[in-house]
Design a protein with these regions (language model features):
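Short glycine/acidic-rich loop motifs that flank beta-strands on beta-rich extracellular proteins
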Residues: 3-12, 20, 36-49, 55, ...
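Surface beta-loop-beta hairpin patches that serve as ligand-binding interfaces in beta-rich domains
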Residues: 132-192
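A structural motif corresponding to the C-terminal lobe/cap of the Radical SAM core domain
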Residues: 100, 108, 143-146
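Glycan-recognition and catalytic regions of carbohydrate-active enzymes
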Residues: 86-89, 146
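Active-site rim elements
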Residues: 84, 104-110, 161-162, 170-174
Length: 192
């Protein structure tokens, strides 16, 4: 995803709904470039987390995603990488594993009253307030710096992760993450 006002993903569950809810969701192998850039107010104010977990979601896995945040164009634009908040309840047992969080400006992780969050082996590349305990977390990556050295915006420098897909008669063309390449990318991140 790129240039999405609302961020990469919304994982949600209304706490007032009495059905099965949102249990066991997985968000993995996504690439987000310059998302979470909403410049206008929503009903809850200026808000646009890259990863937003709303309500009592259970056993969510957020693994091996690349979030490349570019500088926000206005000082009032939300700078949260992750926000877990209430929708008549809070998330429980969310695992964040081996994600890359690249931020050129101070950003924040807001877990609020969510419970039993696990962070393991994530890359915190930049100044991130509210960083949770992550025993295998890293603050630097020479490999990632090398990847983006020619284009810090990420658009061209991370293009090797994508395939061009032509839809139908060619009236639509899109970029899709190449499965093998994104797997290799995360293996290279671990090898340094």
């Amino acid at each position: 995803s790129h240039d999405n006002d609302g961020g990469l993903v919304l994982i949600c569950n209304s706490g007032t709904y009495h059905g099965a809810g949102n249990q066991g969701s997985a968000v993995q192998y996504n690439v987000s470039i310059n998302d979470a850039i909403r410049p206008r107010a929503t009903r809850s104010g200026i808000f646009s987390a890259n990863i937003h977990i709303a309500g009592p979601c259970k056993n969510t896995l957020v693994q091996r995603n690349l979030l490349h945040v570019n500088p926000k164009t206005e000082p009032f634009i939300d700078r949260s990488i992750i926000t877990s908040d209430s929708w008549d309840g809070y998330a429980d047992s969310t695992v964040f594993r081996e994600n890359v969080f690249f931020v050129p400006q101070e950003s924040e992780i807001r877990l609020n009253r969510s419970t039993r969050n696990t962070f393991d082996g994530n890359y915190y590349l930049g100044n991130i307030k509210g960083r949770p305990e992550d025993p295998n977390g890293r603050n630097a990556s020479d490999y990632y710096n090398q990847c983006i050295s020619k284009d810090p915006s990420g658009f061209n420098s991370l293009s090797f992760l994508f395939d061009t897909v032509i839809i139908g008669d060619g009236s639509a063309v899109l970029k899709a993450v190449n499965r093998d390449t994104i797997h290799r990318f995360f293996e290279m991140m671990k090898e340094e």
